[in-house]
Regions:
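Basic, amphipathic alpha-helical segments enriched in Lys/Arg and hydrophobic/aromatic residues
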Residues: 284-321
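Short, glycine/acidic-enriched loop or turn micro-motifs at the edges of active sites
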Residues: 14, 60, 84, 215
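Nucleic-acid-processing active sites and adjacent nucleic-acid-binding tracks
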Residues: 22-53
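Gly/Thr-rich phosphate-binding beta-strand-loop-beta motif of the actin/hexokinase/Hsp70
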Residues: 2-22, 106, 212
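Phosphate-backbone recognition surface of nucleic-acid-processing proteins
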Residues: 207, 212-285, 289, 316-321
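Long, charge-rich intrinsically disordered scaffolds of nucleic-acid metabolism proteins
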Residues: 71, 78-203, 211
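Short glycine-rich phosphate-binding loop at a beta-alpha junction
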Residues: 51-62
Length: 321
């Protein structure tokens, strides 16, 4: 990045977005409505500026349509974890918090990110209509699973008079789960049949794991093994200072992907010979079961990443322990 590179920070709220542009002859701060027509207007305003990077926080979905609109206009967009952005603000002494200040801070954060060699790991590929639909189905299934768990917990403590109501709700949620899962599987088969077949060639990856990876980890196959492990949050991070060597820890990353990968690895540790052998070898070396399982998660993820990058299915001769 040159000193004159243009970077943009966008603070996203439900009704509006605040935009801060740095690197122009004079900085720009402006507010737009958070709706499709305003998204197009913002993209049109930014496109002539030769923007190096646009940064916004993940806000539970309020940022999704804007990010897609800007990416579709050819602008590089990074949607970052809010904790990363807030930690950056604190490190810069920015303790005050308003929408306008946050937008400026995100623009400054963008100015740092564009200098990084691993910038590609921050920029999520553009989600097309099929991927957005699949992501919505994956999210809905996750919501239904959470609702089912809550109702089952209520049932354990319920007195007789309310049990029929809870049981009826459990039955209704179960039917909705079946419907959404069938819809999800059908969508994957219609639009991602080859990629799904590739992913599911690895023992441990079932239909839910495959759909989640396709929907929520579009970087799979585009990054190197270290970048993909760090992105998901299964890469051990150093914690050293001077002569002190701290314990390596995994932290950050995409929680939902990590949760799905955890469940897939539990299955793989029993039914995938390569992962099972790797897990057993780590236990024999004295590793704690949880440490060994995280290492297996990392191995499974990086193997899937290589499979997608090379477009080759699981091969025990290549992906052995």
């Amino acid at each position: 990045m040159s000193v004159t590179s243009v970077v943009v920070g966008i603070d996203v709220a439900k009704a509006h977005v605040d935009v801060s542009v740095l690197g122009c002859p004079s900085s720009i701060a402006q507010r737009f409505d958070n709706e499709a027509e305003a998204h197009s207007a913002l993209a049109a305003a930014l496109k002539p500026l030769d923007v190096a990077l646009v940064v916004m926080e993940a806000t539970g979905g309020y940022e999704a349509a804007l990010a897609c609109a800007l990416q579709a206009a050819g602008l590089p967009v990074a949607v970052v974890n809010p904790r990363q952005a807030r930690d950056f603000a604190k490190s810069m002494g920015r303790l005050a918090k308003t929408d306008r200040i946050d937008a400026r801070m995100l623009a400054e954060f963008a100015g740092v990110l564009v200098r990084r060699d691993d910038l590609a790991s921050f920029i999520r590929p553009l989600a097309d209509a099929q991927q957005q639909a699949l992501a919505a189905m994956v999210t809905r299934r996750r919501q239904l699973v959470t609702m089912m768990l809550s109702e089952r917990q209520r049932l354990q403590l319920a007195i007789a008079i309310v049990r029929p109501s809870i049981e009826a709700m459990i039955e209704a949620i179960g039917q909705q789960l079946d419907d959404v899962e069938a819809q999800m599987v059908g969508h994957v088969q219609a639009h991602y049949a080859e990629l799904n077949k590739l992913l599911r060639s690895a023992a441990g990856i079932g239909p839910v794991a495959s759909a989640t990876l396709i929907a929520e980890l579009p970087e799979l196959g585009r990054l190197n093994r270290r970048e993909i492990a760090a992105l998901v949050g299964v890469a051990p991070m150093a914690n050293d200072s001077g002569n002190s060597k701290g314990r390596r820890r995994v932290q950050g990353g995409r929680f939902e992907i990590r949760r799905v990968l955890y469940m897939a690895t539990l299955t793989a540790a029993r039914h995938n010979p390569a992962i099972k052998a790797f897990y057993d070898r780590l236990l024999a070396a004295g590793k704690l079961p949880k440490v060994a399982l995280v290492a297996c998660m990392r191995k499974l993820l990086t193997t899937l990443n290589a499979m997608v990058r090379t477009n080759k299915p699981w091969d025990k001769s290549l992906h052995g322990a």
